[in-house]
Amino acid sequence: MERADKDLAFLLRYENVAWFEDGEVRILDRRIYPAKVEFVTCRTHQEVARAITDMVTQSAGPYTAAPMGMALAAWECRGKSADEQMEYLKKAAYTISHARPTTQKRMTLLCDICLKEAERALSAGENVAEAIKNKTIQLNNVRYERMAKIGSYLVDMFPDNGTVMTHCFAETIVGTMLRECRSRGKNIRLFCPETRPYFQGARLTASVCHDMGFDVTVISDNMPAFVMQNEKVDVFTTAADAICCDGHVVNKVGTFQNAIVAKYMGIPYFVTGAPDQGHETVDSIHIEMRDPNFTLQAMGVRTAMEGVKGYYPAFDITPPHLVSGVVTDLGIYSPYDLHRYFTDGSIGRDNLVI
């Protein structure tokens, strides 16, 4: 099967996200990359779910780890009857899909696809674990190819020799965006806020940009306004953990404040991804509150006195009036007209997963 991760950075290659083989799922530990290149080995699907919860893999990484975890679950129950295997896999699907509250709907969709593939493989007498693994690769190809289309539309918004600011780690879109810039001969420079407390901007986004040969600068999270004002930023762009059909954008905490500054500075903010039919309005969003102790440290080194309190909402919500456009694989849409996305193209369940 031809793969869509060709010419992308190390971090975006399928095997370096999550990979099932020989009764194990290996997940690149993004919590410590690039200082260390280590993989967490999961020998049960529960361990895969725990790795997702514990942020071993982040951004779109769970969308590879989850179906690979389903392949592992199929391997675990391979000696059972067909009915028993399906029952086991349904329980595994619940465990994996509920590993992180904010992405539960998309993860459920992914796991449902794996369940259908398991039913098909059982009926055909095939190896269920390998069938789900191959389905995962197929899903990745679909997602990466869609991201390439999104990258092309997004790059249209970049001026030659332009300056782009990101936030957190937009995963595949970063790689496909840069690959498109390179293919067009369009030179850009990038500013990446570090994105505490996990430093995804510094460790992941900046690493991908550097790996692919682009001028990239890491800034602290309190610098975006200064940089937008003094470094002639042309575009602010992020991906999203969810794009509600009413135009609200759910993404890594800090996106909202950067969007406010961008609006004030007259800098367009483009969010990338597909509208989420599972979130018709922002009212269905649950903001995940994580361990507040993470805000009291930096890469494991405590920065605050004992007894000081922390506060850690993982995401925030940017209202549509701050969004210049939603960049999809079908083009760029107004945040107030997202339902048109679903009438403009024939979107199947497999293709809804970003």
Predicted regions and their residues:
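A glycine- and small-aliphatic-rich helix-loop capping segment at beta-alpha/alpha-beta transitions
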Residues: 69-76, 113-116, 178-186, 208, ...
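Active-site pocket-lining segments that scaffold enzyme catalytic pockets across diverse folds
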Residues: 132-169, 173
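Acidic-glycine-rich active-site phosphate/pyrophosphate-binding loop
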Residues: 36-46, 124, 129-130, 146, ...
